[in-house]
């Protein structure tokens, strides 16, 4: 100990600043650090501790939990997903055929910090497609046995009614809220996106042309089979949102996935056609971007090299070709060419 201060146990310190009197005396600084450090803990710079306690009703900004057994949701992890339906062709490449705003909440038990359920709020923000499109979610890295139950909320009736559409390509189970006959976790989100908005397929919604409509949210609440986890069994990197549609007379639905998930192939009821991937190369027809992304207006190409100012995000094409370059392309729009 040093002076009247002593420390023992598994304690993690974050040091915001050290008084000048200490830093000017090497011997004193060493004694100070020895006094607060122990073999079970760590000393970190402010904000860099390896241990964090989520903020909540019982912890405030990180206090000792109380004895309550109730739950508190963490702040959401939020992203926007935008899709182009002309895969593997370029088309208008405006990335507004389907726009999803997604927020993920982890519901934790206050006392133990155990994750009880994970809630995905999937908001359908726009439908700029000229053909019927469905939306699904495959969660990679987990099994159906990892899920105790799936419940829904929000505007769920609008989304679920869309599975009655003649354009629906999902084998939707209205008890499990997952897709039948698929060993993977596949959760249908919308049988037909225009149907959710209450318009006919082909009607543009919230793209600057056509209809301006209210956005609707499908709450997907996944109760975990293992109720003792403190680390989530899946994260944004496992959320394989995709769009799908009927292609000619094919029995399987055509699916458009994020580039990051091409290696997983299609779901059991879908196809992506390997020749399409070969043709696509490094291009992409679905991207995950920061929440609230201002997507291109209808018919505005996301990126052009010939007339950059006529596109929505001139730097996008360079990022698509090499994802280590122009990684903040989405922060530099051509203002008059983006929506919201």
Where are the predicted features?
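Extracellular distal adhesion/interaction modules in secreted or cell-surface proteins
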Residues: 1-340
């Amino acid at each position: 100990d040093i002076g009247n201060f002593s420390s023992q146990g598994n304690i993690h310190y974050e040091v915001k600043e050290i008084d000048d009197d200490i830093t000017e005396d090497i011997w004193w600084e060493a004694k100070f650090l020895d006094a607060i450090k122990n073999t079970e803990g760590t000393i970190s710079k402010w904000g860099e501790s390896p241990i964090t306690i989520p903020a909540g009703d019982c912890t405030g900004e990180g206090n000792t939990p109380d004895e309550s057994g109730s739950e508190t949701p963490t702040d959401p992890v939020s992203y926007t997903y935008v899709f182009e339906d002309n895969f593997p062709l370029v088309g208008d490449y405006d990335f507004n055929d389907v726009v999803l705003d997604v927020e993920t909440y982890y519901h934790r038990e206050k006392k133990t910090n155990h994750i009880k359920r994970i809630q995905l709020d999937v908001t359908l923000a726009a439908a700029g497609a000229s053909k019927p499109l469905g939306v699904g979610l495959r969660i990679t890295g987990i099994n159906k046995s990892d899920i105790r139950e799936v419940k829904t909320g929000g505007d769920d009736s609008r989304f679920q009614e869309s599975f009655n559409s003649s354009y629906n390509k999902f084998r939707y189970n209205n008890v499990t809220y997952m897709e039948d006959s698929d060993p993977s976790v596949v959760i249908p989100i919308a049988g037909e996106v225009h149907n959710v908005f209450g318009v006919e397929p082909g009607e543009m919604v919230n793209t600057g042309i056509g209809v301006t409509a209210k956005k609707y949210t499908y709450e997907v609440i996944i109760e975990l089979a293992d109720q003792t986890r403190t680390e989530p069994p899946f994260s944004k990197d496992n959320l394989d949102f995709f769009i799908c549609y009927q292609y000619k007379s094919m029995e399987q639905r055509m699916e458009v996935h994020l580039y990051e998930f091409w290696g997983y192939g299609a779901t059991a009821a879908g196809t992506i056609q390997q020749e399409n991937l070969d043709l696509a190369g490094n291009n992409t027809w679905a991207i995950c971007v920061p929440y609230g992304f201002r997507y291109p207006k209808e018919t505005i190409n996301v990126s052009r090299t010939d007339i950059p100012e006529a596109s929505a995000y001139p730097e996008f094409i360079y990022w698509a070709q090499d994802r280590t370059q122009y990684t903040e392309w989405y922060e530099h729009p051509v203002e008059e060419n983006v929506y919201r």
